[in-house]
């Protein structure tokens, strides 16, 4: 399935993100909604750890257009609700996290788990189911190591399935390393990247920019399809009654 409009590839540091992908755990083609780095200020120097690409299913565009078409990139960037709609919308998402610096699975998964649990407890939605899902999540990563250029990939199903896969190169296809069934965990992974307290402001801003442009093009195409008949209709004489 082709994306709704033309999208371009992106490069973050030395890592390229293709315009479309067919990820593990999905039968669909997803388009690149945005990409950016994650980093931290360490001793006065900004250090980049990972490059992140966020992909969405084609049906995301009409879904998001209902509420967000006509908004500027800055308006979308500033809207917590917009990113919640991206995270929770009824369409597939795929996130590729490529390491710029070496990272162990334990380091990565424990930080993600910590953020998820803190968020759930803060909003009162943490249950035993989430606790078990987190344990499975930690187990998947426990013995993994990720040298520079390796990728951690998440396919998020609207049904609540989180497919996790790993690659030592830029491949995004192949078999899944694990599938965890928990809707809150599935959504929390992407939320931790582009949500209110997301770890990648760069990816968040880029998603807003690219999606705003896609919605603008989608709206323009819709207007071109329906505009002409509407114009012709307006020329029909009105007969008084």
UniProtKB/Swiss-Prot annotation:
<keyword id="KW-0284">Flavonoid biosynthesis</keyword>
<comment type="pathway">
    <text>Secondary metabolite biosynthesis; flavonoid biosynthesis.</text>
</comment>
<dbReference type="InterPro" id="IPR036298">
    <property type="entry name" value="Chalcone_isomerase_sf"/>
</dbReference>
<feature type="binding site">
    <location>
        <position position="192"/>
    </location>
    <ligand>
        <name>substrate</name>
    </ligand>
</feature>
<dbReference type="Pfam" id="PF02431">
    <property type="entry name" value="Chalcone"/>
</dbReference>
<dbReference type="InterPro" id="IPR016088">
    <property type="entry name" value="Chalcone_isomerase_3-sand"/>
</dbReference>
<comment type="function">
    <text>Catalyzes the intramolecular cyclization of bicyclic chalcones into tricyclic (S)-flavanones. Responsible for the isomerization of 4,2',4',6'-tetrahydroxychalcone (also termed chalcone) into naringenin.</text>
</comment>
<keyword id="KW-0413">Isomerase</keyword>
<feature type="site" description="Important for catalytic activity">
    <location>
        <position position="108"/>
    </location>
</feature>
<dbReference type="GO" id="GO:0009813">
    <property type="term" value="P:flavonoid biosynthetic process"/>
</dbReference>
<comment type="similarity">
    <text>Belongs to the chalcone isomerase family.</text>
</comment>
<feature type="binding site">
    <location>
        <position position="115"/>
    </location>
    <ligand>
        <name>substrate</name>
    </ligand>
</feature>
<protein>
    <recommendedName>
        <fullName>Chalcone--flavanone isomerase C</fullName>
        <ecNumber>5.5.1.6</ecNumber>
    </recommendedName>
</protein>
<dbReference type="InterPro" id="IPR016089">
    <property type="entry name" value="Chalcone_isomerase_bundle_sf"/>
</dbReference>
<dbReference type="GO" id="GO:0045430">
    <property type="term" value="F:chalcone isomerase activity"/>
</dbReference>
<dbReference type="InterPro" id="IPR044164">
    <property type="entry name" value="CFI"/>
</dbReference>
<feature type="binding site">
    <location>
        <position position="50"/>
    </location>
    <ligand>
        <name>substrate</name>
    </ligand>
</feature>
<dbReference type="InterPro" id="IPR016087">
    <property type="entry name" value="Chalcone_isomerase"/>
</dbReference>
């Amino acid at each position: 399935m082709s994306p709704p409009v033309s999208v371009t590839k992106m490069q973050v540091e030395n890592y390229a993100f293709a315009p479309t992908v067919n990820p593990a755990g999905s039968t669909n083609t997803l388009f690149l909604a945005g990409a950016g780095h994650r980093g931290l200020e360490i001793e006065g120097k900004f250090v980049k750890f990972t490059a992140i690409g966020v992909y969405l299913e084609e049906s995301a565009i009409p879904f998001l257009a209902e509420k967000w078409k006509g908004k500027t990139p800055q308006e979308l960037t500033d809207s917590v609700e917009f990113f919640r709609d991206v995270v929770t919308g009824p369409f597939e998402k795929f996130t590729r996290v490529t390491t710029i610096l070496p990272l162990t699975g334990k380091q990565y998964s424990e930080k993600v788990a910590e953020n998820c649990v803190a968020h759930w407890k803060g909003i009162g939605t943490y249950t035993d189911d989430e606790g078990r899902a987190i344990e499975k999540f930690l187990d998947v990563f426990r013995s993994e190591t990720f040298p520079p250029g390796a990728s951690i990939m998440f396919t998020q199903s609207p049904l609540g399935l989180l497919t996790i896969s790993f690659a030592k190169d830029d491949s995004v296809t192949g078999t899944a390393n694990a599938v965890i069934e928990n809707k809150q965990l599935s959504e929390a992974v992407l939320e931790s990247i582009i949500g209110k307290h997301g770890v990648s402001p760069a990816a968040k801003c880029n998603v807003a920019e690219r999606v705003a442009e896609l919605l603008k093009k989608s709206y323009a195409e819709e207007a071109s399809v329906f505009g002409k008949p509407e114009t012709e209709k307006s020329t029909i004489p009105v007969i008084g009654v």
